[in-house]
């Protein structure tokens, strides 16, 4: 379960996200083995706020979202410093808007960082939309599976790193 996906705007950890999570978690616990992923403010990047006042429950992980063309060393340091179990539930090889080219060097830094720390991840996005972060070429036919010749530069990088 991922609750509070990318909270943003005037949302705070202490007054919005954490109280909501503490209300929803007991309901989810009907499935006693469920891992619950909780986002933090600023599009799941304020892990330092969650670290100051973590949720007191079992099987909780905190999500982080990043884009290689926008989020660099400062966010990696924030993750390293937070001391929380982290799952990267969204990341892309592009800038945060999904475009701006593919930043393979920075994406590799992120892959290395996550691998060194045993951080699991999900990439954005498995689609054929005409944007840098898309894994599939525009018009790709995926009815019979995905072939390498239907992958974008981003898609090839991501699939290589699974």
Regions found by a protein language model. Give the residues of each.
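Extracellular glycoside hydrolase catalytic/binding regions
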Residues: 4-120, 124-128, 133-160
